[in-house]
Amino acid sequence: KRLPGESGVSVNQVIPEGASLKYLKDLPRAWFNAVPYREVGLMTATFSEKEYGMPYISITPMGISNTADFIEQIGKLVNVWASVLSERKLNYRLYVENQTKFV
């Protein structure tokens, strides 16, 4: 939740954290799925992609390189929607550079 939130992305649901049937109905409202650990959630993400056309990211954000890739993939997917809804794209590269500059 923290990593996408810091880059300006609202998190719809974190599954299985605190999940219940009440909240599962909101899953199709997401713009994409993030699967930071393939052991948990990959089957749900592939189902959502097949059933709802919802893309997913399956990169474990550990280490500088993978974390940067994870954020950049989020940026690409968010920009698809941002350009449709507001005709404005967001630059996530600057966020990645700021987060990794002094490491």
From Swiss-Prot:
As one GO molecular function, the record gives: 4 iron, 4 sulfur cluster binding
The keyword Iron is assigned to this record: yes
Q: Tell me its cofactors.
A: [4Fe-4S] cluster
Question: Which Gene Ontology CC terms are recorded?
Answer: chloroplast
Cofactor remark: Binds 1 [4Fe-4S] cluster per heterodimer. The cluster is bound at the heterodimer interface by residues from both subunits.
Pfam families linked to this entry = Oxidored_nitro
What does the record give as the reaction this protein catalyses? chlorophyllide a + oxidized 2[4Fe-4S]-[ferredoxin] + 2 ADP + 2 phosphate = protochlorophyllide a + reduced 2[4Fe-4S]-[ferredoxin] + 2 ATP + 2 H2O
GO BP terms = light-independent chlorophyll biosynthetic process; photosynthesis
Q: Which UniProt keywords apply?
A: 4Fe-4S, ATP-binding, Chlorophyll biosynthesis, Chloroplast, Iron, Iron-sulfur, Metal-binding, Nucleotide-binding, Oxidoreductase, Photosynthesis, Plastid
Specify the pathway. Porphyrin-containing compound metabolism; chlorophyll biosynthesis (light-independent)
Annotated EC: 1.3.7.7
Q: Protease: present as a keyword of the record? A: no
* Compartment(s) of residence: Plastid, Chloroplast
Q: What class of enzyme is it?
A: oxidoreductase
Its job: Component of the dark-operative protochlorophyllide reductase (DPOR) that uses Mg-ATP and reduced ferredoxin to reduce ring D of protochlorophyllide (Pchlide) to form chlorophyllide a (Chlide). This reaction is light-independent. The NB-protein (ChlN-ChlB) is the catalytic component of the complex.
- What quaternary arrangement does the UniProt entry report? Protochlorophyllide reductase is composed of three subunits; ChlL, ChlN and ChlB. Forms a heterotetramer of two ChlB and two ChlN subunits.
PANTHER family recorded for this chain?
Answer: LIGHT-INDEPENDENT PROTOCHLOROPHYLLIDE REDUCTASE SUBUNIT B
Membership in a protein family: Belongs to the ChlB/BchB/BchZ family.
The protein's name: Light-independent protochlorophyllide reductase subunit B
Annotated source species: Claytosmunda claytoniana
Gene that encodes the chain: chlB
